[in-house]
Amino acid sequence: MGLHNPLPSSLKSECKKAGKILTSFVDPRQTLGAQEVIPPSVLTNAKGLVIMTVLKAGFLFSGRIGSGLIVARLDDGTWSAPSAVMTGGMGVGAQIGSELTDFVIILNSKAAVQTFARLGSITLGGNLSIAAGPLGRNAEAGGGASVGGMAPMFSYSKTKGLFAGVSLEGSVLVERRDANRSLYRGDITAKRLLSGQVAQPAAADPLYRVLNSKIFNLNRGDEGDIYNDVPIYADDEPEDIWGPSSKSTKRRDSADRSSSYSRRGDSYRSNRSRAHDDDDEDDYSFSRSKSLSRKTAGGSLRSSKMDNRRSKYADTPSPRRSRSYSDEDEESVYSSDVSTESSSQFSSRSSEYSKPSRPTAPKPKFKQDSLGPNQARAMYSFAGEQPGDLSFQKGDIIDIVERSGSHDDWWTGRIGYREGIFPANYVKLS
């Protein structure tokens, strides 16, 4: 079990932490085995989740602090935008030691979600009863039921450390409006977030990658490996490296290279120490459209996301280049440097040499590689933003694998051994 930060941080960081914690509770590959995971039946029927890390420490007098998030499943089966939460408290008695605990709390009823949404807080074991949830891949949700029926909340935890005499029951979870305000750029309440009135933020992608996997959306006919699309996180890797492949790493490296050109030297180094809140605002500016992020009747969640991304690029035929160091900028800087150097050299030697005249022969025209019948040339650079995107640079030649009759669409292409989808209005056919 890796150590996670229990102190309140930006909602973007909370989403990364929540994604890591959640995979360690639901995937047998990241636990002690198939008998130590939250049952898929519980996950599929969950109406909401609370994911958080709590630190408890003390000697006679003890303190407790923790932070995380809450997210709700909407009526159409998709997930709401997350709301940041925190808990804290003091205690007295025969208590000694320290303990760091990751919690996943399954909200089994809409009433549990609505209670938090309405009040902005919820008391574990107070407003609604809470019980230890069933464990094991083949366990049923009824395994954690009380005498009066299934408990409104199931609790799962993993602990690092030793602490005697403290329970999370009775703790109050409170929404963190400061973190919500920072990410969503407004005074957004948990009620609006959990009811689906706010679009899913791009900063929560590490969390949605887990929530949109098969184990949270099982059908009766599902067979085979139901865990093969759960992202894998390595505890010895940096916090923002995700999934079984390195696509997220490539996106981060690409962004770092772009940023290094536009913010050089001391200015660049100082800007790297900016607060998380600025990052949150940037991430939310790329959030999905609410109307297209919801799954329509009979449609798939993937197709809804595709429609949303198509809409995004159909409205912007040219890429965002404001933070990138473009080819034209590089040429301009190079030309300026050469011109300055040449002027200095010739002025100092004007008594010895005269400037040569331009050649009379016409400039050669270098022909670009010709395109095949199923090939296209990239007119703009495209940095993929999600798994399955095909990233490319301006001028790259793309082999078209599948396409439609419209350029306001997403096509499938291949560059070398890489294959994925890309916006068709970024390329030009032969």
Curated annotation (Swiss-Prot):
Phosphotyrosine sites (modified residues): 325
Pfam families: SH3_1 (PF00018), Ysc84 (PF04366)
Sites of Phosphothreonine modification: 316
GO cellular component: actin cortical patch
Stretches for region Disordered: 237-372
Start and end residues of each SH3 domain: 371-430
Comp. bias regions, Low complexity: 333-358
SMART domains recorded: SH3
Keywords: Phosphoprotein, SH3 domain
Tree of life domain: Eukaryota
Family the entry assigns: Belongs to the SH3YL1 family.
Name of the protein: SH3 domain-containing protein PJ696.02
Organism of origin: Schizosaccharomyces pombe (strain 972 / ATCC 24843) (Fission yeast)
Organism phylogeny: Eukaryota, Fungi, Dikarya, Ascomycota, Taphrinomycotina
